[in-house]
Regions:
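Outer-membrane beta-barrel pore domains
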Residues: 36, 45-53, 71, 88-96, ...
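Short, acidic Gly/Pro/Ser/Thr-rich loop/turn segments
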Residues: 2, 161, 173, 305
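Outer membrane beta-barrel
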Residues: 29-171, 180-184, 191-198, 248-261, ...
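Short helix-to-loop capping/linker segments positioned immediately adjacent to catalytic or ligand/cofactor-binding
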Residues: 174-178, 188-189, 202-204, 237
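Interfacial loop-to-helix transition and helix-capping segments at the boundaries
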Residues: 177-183, 240-242
């Protein structure tokens, strides 16, 4: 009976979101023309990577997307990914994996918006940024990857002033066909622009067994860009806290051609272990051939462990083509 009530409440919630965002059509006014022709896009990121005592060429990402508008207030996006890094060998003779990343319908009306399907959850600033626009080849250790899940998200925007986002998702991650524990995960994020060029905000995530909080800021002025985040997560079952932060600065040396990047990051996976903290120091360069559509990104990161040093310094040279 409880499961049935949850199902009914979710259905009613989705209906209310759609009904709220769907504008009532005036009786004698025709809707503005909107192209419903699907648009095809994607990007490739082949790279050379030297990590510790191993070196290899690999395909970091290969993503292909189809997106389009259904009417003036509804659109969709479908994106799939082929990759070799960290992919399970299926079949065993091939290290290439295929999976879906974005699978959603987006609704918008004025300052309000909603997303239904599989999308990036509103939490970390760096995880919400596309890998095609990042200044570095890899996200920081505490962020690691863009979090995606299946559910519904609502947002409200005051242009150049405020962004408020909230989401309810299964909490099982992307490409999951069920929610075994029947418990939802909840996300909330607020971003404010007190002065031009400066965005500051915070976010919260709540799972059935863990919670997390994020403080974030980004500043852009002239040729300079600065971005920083602090994340703290708590696993209630083990009572372990994980913390991490990063601070990044980028300077455009030659407009539309060369950008220098530096980053310091730190990650402590457990406050129960006194010797597991790791600090990383990165220097890098972006060379733009045609903006983010065609560029080379090279960076080198030195990691320093709290006690025992490990051979895990990382050098990456990656080419990106986006269309």
């Amino acid at each position: 009976m409880r499961s049935s009530r949850r199902s009914v409440s979710r259905t009613v919630g989705l209906w209310l979101v759609t009904a709220t965002l769907a504008p009532a059509a005036p009786a004698q006014t025709s809707a503005p023309a909107v192209s419903t022709t699907p648009r095809v896009g994607g990007y490739l990121q082949p790279r050379f990577q030297d990590f510790g005592d191993s070196a290899t060429f690999l395909l970091r990402r290969a993503r292909f997307a189809i997106e389009g508008s259904i009417n003036p207030w509804a659109s969709y996006r479908v994106q799939v990914e082929m990759r070799t890094l960290g992919a399970p060998a299926v079949p065993a003779s091939s290290p290439l994996s295929l999976s879906a990343t974005d699978l959603y319908i987006k609704l918008s009306q004025g300052a309000w918006g909603a997303t239904v399907g599989q999308f990036r959850v509103p939490f970390s600033l760096e995880s919400l940024l596309s890998s095609t626009t990042l200044e570095t080849n890899e996200r920081s250790r505490i962020v690691n990857a863009a979090k995606r899940d299946i559910g519904v998200q609502a947002e409200w925007r005051w242009p150049d002033r405020v962004v408020l986002q909230g989401a309810v998702v299964n909490g099982e991650g992307p490409n999951r066909g069920s929610n075994p524990d029947n418990r939802m995960a909840y996300f909330a994020r607020a971003l404010f622009t007190p002065i031009k060029g400066l965005d500051v905000g915070g976010a919260f995530e709540g799972y059935s067994d863990s919670t997390g909080a994020d403080a974030q800021a980004v500043y852009r002025r002239g040729r300079w860009t600065g971005r920083a985040e602090y994340i703290r997560e708590h696993n209630r079952r083990s009572d372990v806290h994980a913390t991490g932060w990063y601070a990044l600065a980028a300077y455009t040396l030659l407009p539309e051609r060369v950008q220098l990047v530096g980053r310091v990051e730190q990650f402590d996976p457990s406050d129960r272990v006194a010797t597991d903290r790791e600090t990383g120091y990165l220097v890098g360069l972006q060379y733009f051939i045609r903006g983010d559509a065609f560029k080379l990104v090279a960076d080198y990161e030195v990691f320093r462990e709290q006690v025992v040093q490990v051979t895990n310094n990382r050098a990456i040279v990656q080419m990106q083509v986006r269309w």
